[in-house]
Amino acid sequence: MQDLKTSLVEVFGKTNLVESFDELTLTVGSQNIIKTCLKLRDFFSFDTLIDLCGVDYLTYGQSDWNGNASASGFSRGRSHQGLKDIHEERFAVVYHLLSVSKNKRIRVKSFVDEVEPIIKSVTDIWASADWYEREAFDLMGILFENHTDLRRILTDYGFTGHPLRKDFPMIGEVEMRYDEDLCRVIYEKVSIEPNVNVPRVIRK
């Protein structure tokens, strides 16, 4: 781990690299994502993209829960004090890379614009990014430039919005049911009320 960290610092700089829980996270600007990923693949042998996802930091450090978060168990968390200013940028794309030959992993994080969340596709670098990028587009609304087939992959064809965004209502916008009179599936405005049942916590 230390040898990899030293080599990465020499190439990308110390300020862009963070080590936490025996994992390395490299943060790069969205305009440099292709150049960075090529270096990681060609010079550091990160030949496999094992995961890609979008992250929405809109409500990071905030809570709708009035009680205290548990100090143990599944809902354990830490204080929200001082967390509101950690992420000024809202959307990030996170890549998890694996070097099979060296048995090393690294996380790459790149923030994108909130109004126009666009970043270049890495499908030409790792073919496995294809459906991952489609999923991030579908659920988070992040656009991947030069992706050859960027369409929804999980939600319905007529779905409106991106359901993993923090400002998307938890109850959804519409509900679907089968109408016996019309003999077809119909969409109606959602009929349930929103309710916060569990505390929002930040895992230790």
From Swiss-Prot:
It catalyses: a quinone + NADH + 5 H(+)(in) = a quinol + NAD(+) + 4 H(+)(out). Signal peptide: none annotated. It holds the Pfam family Complex1_30kDa. It is found in: Cell inner membrane. The keyword Ligase does not apply. It comes from the Bacteria. Keywords: Cell inner membrane, Cell membrane, Membrane, NAD, Quinone, Translocase, Transport, Ubiquinone. Gene3D superfamilies: NADH:ubiquinone oxidoreductase, 30kDa subunit. GO terms for molecular function: NADH dehydrogenase (ubiquinone) activity; NADH:ubiquinone reductase (non-electrogenic) activity; quinone binding. It is a peripheral membrane protein. Its EC number is 7.1.1.-. InterPro entries: NADH_DH_suC, NADH_quin_OxRdtase_su_C/D-like, NADH_UbQ_OxRdtase_30kDa_su, NADH_UbQ_OxRdtase_CS. SUPFAM superfamilies: Nqo5-like. It is an enzyme of class 7 (translocase). NDH-1 is composed of 14 different subunits. Subunits NuoB, C, D, E, F, and G constitute the peripheral sector of the complex. Belongs to the complex I 30 kDa subunit family. NDH-1 shuttles electrons from NADH, via FMN and iron-sulfur (Fe-S) centers, to quinones in the respiratory chain. The immediate electron acceptor for the enzyme in this species is believed to be ubiquinone. Couples the redox reaction to proton translocation (for every two electrons transferred, four hydrogen ions are translocated across the cytoplasmic membrane), and thus conserves the redox energy in a proton gradient. This is NADH-quinone oxidoreductase subunit C. It comes from Vesicomyosocius okutanii subsp. Calyptogena okutanii (strain HA). The lineage of its organism: Bacteria, Pseudomonadati, Pseudomonadota, Gammaproteobacteria, Candidatus Pseudothioglobaceae. The gene is nuoC.
